């Protein structure tokens, strides 16, 4: 049974390993999942996600562990985004962990920065008091010694050890900076109940961290739990790095009494907590992966029986005129009414998908959007971007140069608009069905204000140029980029590893949905990986007629095409079998 660790710290707060090193260690230990929960900071999540994504893509999709509802060890270590918020409850310090927050949200990050500013003010006052005790220390010295870190008392102790003011880090706490010591300055903190509400506002799953510390401090843990539960607390760390079996049983009893889901972790800090090991703590802690699955089910409103349907738009759900038939809507309503999830999966950019959704009035409960062939995933209910991979400016510049050398028109995008090198028949053709504004600019890499998920090339008169372009991209970039033919006149370039099939695997794991409960439908080359990854891959008849080779990657072919409700008829038949 794979185990997990949902409480760790990196160099972005007071740990000694970088976010990527944490993920690497978790992978070497065989952990199925790792949560990065730095103090009042999500600055390390992007780096950790990049490392976890690399291992995810290297792992074999056919690993049988992927058939369990627990995070699949066959897909590498899953990175759970998180944060640990320092709070105050009746004059005492209490920590609240938030799992799965909307960490990309600028307002969320700005709020955390304000919390850090209060920490900086406290640290400057502590430096002043330490200088009064003969310790030559300035806040700027700490920042230089620990670049990129959120400075905590642990950093004070390490700095004093390096400079010879103490012989052990614990001596710094005992003599100078521990609670009630002469150089300790309490920090103005958000209240514990407000922190829970704050985390909920940004779609996190709030968990009370290391509750046994508050229990042993002799103030009323039950009163704390009652207040936090009323504010919306959803979990509690039954598992913790220093817990005894008695501690585990005590906190588990409280979890049951207050309707809180178990969570937990080692609170690993690297060398800053000697003897404490990731995944096991100080002893033999082992957190079953099912703990995370239960959290996902509660957080994302899924379950072991939930099914998920990834559906292409153009040529699959949409008719030739880009409309969706009343019967297709009826069947999709039936699908979501049964508690299953629907994913609008397209090669289009996210802004364009949202335009299509509004145009069609297609608002389904629990619907998710997968854009740019799986490079970006968006949760419609929460408004949270769950996943996003982008090209960098150097890649954009090189791709445009290759397109120019072949004589191809190319365009790219930001979150709200397209960028094209010139206007002409290609723009007229492309934007006939895409209702997104565009800017004209020669250098696409310099023009984009936000990094794009893809670059699009168009050839209206000589499709052979697309094949040449595709070959040149492969020679120049190898596995660094993926290239898809999404239309007879289009080729799209996305980051390496990105595909609709990868998005299916990633989203099943994030939502806690069994891979064997997945379905996918499509009609084109860029849908093939999705059809192969799904337990049931549905190829449209029109796709099979245009690209017969796609039939080898599908489990079934619809009897009718996209203009004859081919998809809706097939999905209705599947629902009939599920209901039988």
Question: Which residue stretches match the model-derived regions?
Answer:
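Extreme N-terminal starter segment of soluble prokaryotic enzymes
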Residues: 1-4, 305-310
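Conserved acidic, metal-coordinating active-site core of Asp-based
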Residues: 148-211, 402-521, 525-528, 533
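Mg2+-dependent phosphoryl-transfer enzymes with acidic/Ser/Thr/Gly-rich catalytic loops
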Residues: 302-308, 325, 492-580
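Active-site phosphate-binding/coordination module
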Residues: 47-50, 80, 84-117, 326-427
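An N-terminally biased module of ancient metal coordination in phosphate/nucleic-acid-related enzymes
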Residues: 1-92, 177-178, 190-198, 202-257, ...
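Catalytic core of soluble alpha/beta enzymes
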Residues: 266-299
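Extended substrate/RNA-proximal surfaces in nucleic-acid metabolism proteins
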Residues: 50-222, 286, 291-293, 396-398
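Substrate-recognition/cap helix-loop segment adjacent to the acidic, metal-dependent catalytic center
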Residues: 219-232, 349-368, 464-482
């Amino acid at each position: 049974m794979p185990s997990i660790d949902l409480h760790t710290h990196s160099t972005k707060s007071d740990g000694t390993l970088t976010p990527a090193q944490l993920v690497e260690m978790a992978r070497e230990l065989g952990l199925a999942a790792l949560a990065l929960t730095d103090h009042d900071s999500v600055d390390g999540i992007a780096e950790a996600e990049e490392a976890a994504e690399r291992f995810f893509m290297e792992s074999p999709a056919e690993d049988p562990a992927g058939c369990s509802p627990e995070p699949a060890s066959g897909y590498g270590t899953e990175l759970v985004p998180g944060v640990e918020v320092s709070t105050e409850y009746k004059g005492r310090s209490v920590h609240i962990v938030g799992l799965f927050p909307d960490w990309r949200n600028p307002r969320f990050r700005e709020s955390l920065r304000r919390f850090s500013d209060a920490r900086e003010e406290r640290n400057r006052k502590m430096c002043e008091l330490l200088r009064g005790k003969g310790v030559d220390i300035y806040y700027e010295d700490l920042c230089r010694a620990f670049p990129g870190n959120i400075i905590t008392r642990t950093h004070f102790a390490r700095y004093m050890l390096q400079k010879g003011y103490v012989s052990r880090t614990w001596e710094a706490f005992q003599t100078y900076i521990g609670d009630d010591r002469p150089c300790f300055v309490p920090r103005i903190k958000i209240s514990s109940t407000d922190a829970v509400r704050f985390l909920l506002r940004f779609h996190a799953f709030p968990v009370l961290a290391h509750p046994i510390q508050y229990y042993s401090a002799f103030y009323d843990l039950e009163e704390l739990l009652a207040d936090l539960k009323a504010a919306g607390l959803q979990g509690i760390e039954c598992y913790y790095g220093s817990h005894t079996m008695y501690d585990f049983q005590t906190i588990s009893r409280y979890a049951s009494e207050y309707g809180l889901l178990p969570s937990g972790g080692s609170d690993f800090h690297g060398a800053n907590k000697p003897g404490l090991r990731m995944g096991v703590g100080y002893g033999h802690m082992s957190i079953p992966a099912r703990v995370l699955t239960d959290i996902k089910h509660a957080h994302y409103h899924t379950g072991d029986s939930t099914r998920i349907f990834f559906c292409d738009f153009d040529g699959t759900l949409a008719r030739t005129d880009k409309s969706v038939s009343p019967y297709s809507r009826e069947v999709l309503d039936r699908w979501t009414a049964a508690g299953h999830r629907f994913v609008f999966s397209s090669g289009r950019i996210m802004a364009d998908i949202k335009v299509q959704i509004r145009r069609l009035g297609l608002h389904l409960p629990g619907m998710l959007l997968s854009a740019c062939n799986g490079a970006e995933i968006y949760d419609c209910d929460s408004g949270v971007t769950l996943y996003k991979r982008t090209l960098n400016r150097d890649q954009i510049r090189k791709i445009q140069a290759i397109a120019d050398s072949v004589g191809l028109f190319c365009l790219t995008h930001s979150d709200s608009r397209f960028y094209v090198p010139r206007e002409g028949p290609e723009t007229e053709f492309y934007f006939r069905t895409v209702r997104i504004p565009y800017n004209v600019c020669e250098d696409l890499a310099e023009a984009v204000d936000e990094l794009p998920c893809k670059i699009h090339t168009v050839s209206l008169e000589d499709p052979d140029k697309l094949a040449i372009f595709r070959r040149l991209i492969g020679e120049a970039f190898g596995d660094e980029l993926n290239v898809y033919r999404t239309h007879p006149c289009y080729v799209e370039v996305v980051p390496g590893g990105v595909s609709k099939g990868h998005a299916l695997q990633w989203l099943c794991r994030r939502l806690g949905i069994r891979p064997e409960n997945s379905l996918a439908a499509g009609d084109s080359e860029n849908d093939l990986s999705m059809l192969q990854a799904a337990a049931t891959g549905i190829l449209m008849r029109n796709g099979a007629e245009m690209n017969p080779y796609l039939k080898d990657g599908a489990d079934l072919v619809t009897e009718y095409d996209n203009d004859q409700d081919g998809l809706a008829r097939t999905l209705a038949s599947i629902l009939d079998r599920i209901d039988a």
